Amino acid sequence: MKTRNATVEGRFYPSSREKVFDQIQEIERQEKYPVRDLQAEHIYGGVLPHAGHVYSGYQTVPFFQLINRTGKLPGTFVILHPNHTGSGLPLAVDEADLWSNSIGDVPLDMEMAEAMDLPFSRLSHAHEHSAEVIIPYMPSYMKGHAFSIVPVCMMVQDPESARYVAERILHATAEVKKEVMVLASSDFSHFLSPSEGKKKDQLVIDEIMKKNIPGVADAVRKNQVTI
């Protein structure tokens, strides 16, 4: 059995299970982005940041709280994430059977991964943090419900590649007949003032909400948004 060991544990998130849970509880207590007034019957996916938990937790925790409230918990999370290292293939699923970090071992859904029929690459995922940092949040909100992951590392992120990966996910979901949730890992704007970052990000979010794939790409390119 092949295991991918954590690469940013102790830096991007705490190095022990107890400290991870303590940090999540503290973020919940601060309630920067309350979800109590939000309504959602079914959540199919989301965009989550991959910065350290002291930053990203204030967006990620409310998302998982909302999933928890629906009571419709996925069996598999497909995590689409960038490639910061430049290593590996343009598009790749990890070939490990388990991802290990401070919250324990999380299995990969190899049935779903194989049905997606994308290339496998250990190197694409070995030192990449953008999927790893999301996983420690999951156990707190899954109510003991078993879950697995399919990390998909996307070095290329053009509309054609995005459409191709989406088609592969749709095909695989129909084939394996599982409850799947798709998570896209992105920090959106970097190194800008809050007001400027919010303004630029909103241009892209508006196109996402319209489900306008070319519009998303155009907004990113024309406004030089770091997504």
Language-model features: where?
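Active-site histidine-anchored catalytic micro-motif
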Residues: 1-227
